């Protein structure tokens, strides 16, 4: 067992270049790369200099001031942190190597995360894995001095770089140096937690095994914002516009462009995950389709299981904010405006449900009073997310078409809390026309079909556990759904839905666009899924104009990409001994059934709120 007194600081990483074992492996790698041994030694040193962090204690205080200067240009200085959990982690770090994996919503994430540790005297600060694209002039030097490790995006075909990185990771793990990185790899453009990137996690797990590092804890960290500084960029990317390249000029424009007040930043630490916690995990669950990448019969890899547990733990501590709830309510109104009273009546019920379930809340969360809802609406108007029309009988509020994708981002940050209820509503709506009474087995079959359709969108818990929540939430709203005393159609009218149409409509409609266009191709293969997803934006626009889909939030290259991922998983892009046209038609029928069910939910909602 390696103890802390045996360890070296991160600045001593260059000693690995003189290690006998490394030199022997470098000789073999030089042959594969076509370099002489001298060239290989020189290139290996260059690779290590490029990637290695050079942290210095004297740089931490000025770096923390710099980080605060950046995020406080728009956000409140005081971070909302669950400090009691952070204190427990401080105690845990004495006997365990802590690896922090955080959600990635904004460029502000790493600044807020490191300040949350620094200001609470958490030492040593973890070294941060970052993309080489952030190693631009000026910023890269500072970041390296406070512990940034810069990695190339692709290095699979570079045997020397891979060798250096493997030995560098071994050095970090062997010397018990805490590490941190974004489990998503890149910023979420939709608001939902993105599928985890397994690259760094796999390297770290393999290093832990090689170094026999037993006491390792993966710490999930949720970083959330009242408002996202980059929200307009995310909307543009979903609409097919190119991503802006990072540079010093870009960084300066980004920082000094932050002028409006964006509210609070929330840093919430979750329950640590150990390797032992994930043994046998995912046997009955889905990891946003990650298991589909594993070899047949092998089951999910250790990295997949760890990533899934970390992501679900992040979701469990993500705070629910008042504006997130109101965007869900307003987006569920089918493009119509709601009065303040109507928003309040719907939001109050959701707030009561949230408190009953004991879900994590942002500090100051309150929607139980009309005055509180009014204040949130005022704030959302200030952010141009919501508009008011006050020249009629009563003032009404709505999300304009060009802000639907932005509003959907905030709604999506909390949809996982209401997913079981949403799927229960859709499953009931699918069977609403049946003459026979819906039984529990039928409901479960429909829910599992919905899980399979949306497997690349959400992190689903094991099937039995998830369906138990579906039953609980469905029975909470529709107590006689399986009793037969009242038809499902009547029950859905009497108790209008809350979540199915509000959460799943944009995804289902985006998949409908994918399915329609694929079906029209017949047997024609799709060889470039990325290009095809971008090309779907125009058919999506056409279908919106023809009212085959309902709103702008269904026209999203990100949603089209996950829809195509599902189609690819089902073998519907390239012929592989099956009839593509027939398979695509079945896919279209499945998605159309879901869209039809959601339309039924929407019509019942509209009847309840817009029929005088």
Segments (PLM) and residue ranges:
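Membrane-interfacial terminal anchoring regions of lipid-handling membrane enzymes
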Residues: 1-612
